[in-house]
Every structure is written in structure tokens, then in C-alpha cells.
Amino acid sequence: FAMAYVIRPYRDDDAEVLAEILALAITDIGPHAYSPAQVAAWAARHPGARRYRERVAAGDVIFVAADVDDRPVAYVLLEQDGHIDHLYNHPEHTRRGLATQLLATAATYARKHGMERLYAEASDLARPAFQRAGFTATHKREFTIPHGDRDVPIHNWGVEKPLS
């Protein structure tokens, strides 16, 4: 059955839930495309709830998809230069079109604020959602994430969408 979702701006009391969504998305959905070492290194990079408050205070914009109880189940984080740094879905709320709606909301905001393009680094898992929203994959990015005493190789995709 279809649940009703509302896209709304971030509120301060969302921070803890967003940190949970991020951790769950990486650890639950990540293994479908990435190795255990890659997933562990990716998850360890993210410092938790406080960081959302700092980023919003610094001018980043977050839109959340909230369920009928107004609890966030997905979100997008947009920086003022058009860079989308986060696009994450709670594992129980994937394949509902939320990523597409969040990216459309980010694009509307970006146009209104004079940004000329949106761009992101998309995981293998997120790339189809970006492409459905009109982004083009420009290149594959191979890099490493330091984790414990080693560097874990991983990759993602540069994607972008002109807004003009």
C-alpha cells in the first residue's frame, strides 16, 4: 500500500534521525554493491548528528521526506555551490520515488537561488536515481578511504545536471 510522504525542510530535531538513516543506508544497502571492508570504511567516515547542525548553520540546505508520523525516512543535503553531498533513504523506504522527489526539490531550490548546475558523487546504488532525475554520469571516480591501518579502494560516479 502507498504511504503518504511529505517533502519538507530540515528541522533541528531531525539531526539524530538523519544520522540513523545514513548509517542504516550504508550498512544495509551498501553490501548490495560494495565489499564488507568498503562498507565499513564508508560508514566510519560519517560523524553523526552534530555534523548536520553544523552544516545547516554553515549554509547547507537539507530537505527530508517524512512519513505520516512526520519522521524523516530519506533526505538530500545540498551545498550552496550546487553540490549534493548526501542522498540517503532508510532501507525500509526505498523504491518509493523519494530520491527522485528530493532531487526535484533540490533542483527547484537551486534554480531559485541562482545555481547553474547540480552535481554529486553517486554510488553504484544511487546512480540510477540521479539518472532518473535527469543527471548525466560524467566519469567514474576511483579512490581510497583510510580505514584502520589500511586504505580501502572504492569508487563512485561524477554526475551532474545543468539547471539553465
Regions found by a protein language model. Name each.
Residues G59, H83, E116, P153-H155:
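Exposed loop/turn and edge beta-strand positions of beta-sandwich/beta-sheet ligand-binding modules
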Residues Y5, P9-D12, E20-E92, L103-T105, ...:
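Acetyl-CoA-dependent GNAT
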Residues Y119-E121, T136-G158:
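Conserved catalytic-core motifs of GNAT/GCN5-like acyltransferases
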Residues A110-S123:
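Conserved GNAT acetyl-CoA-binding A-motif
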Residues G97:
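Conserved G/P- and acidic residue-centered "switch" motifs that form tight phosphate/ATP-binding loops
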Residues L102, A126-A129:
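Conserved short alpha-helix immediately C-terminal to the canonical SAM/SAH-binding motif I
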Residues F130-Q131, F135:
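Conserved active-site tyrosine of GNAT-family acetyltransferases
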Residues F1-A2:
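Short, Lys/Arg-enriched N-terminal segments with co-localized hydrophobic residues
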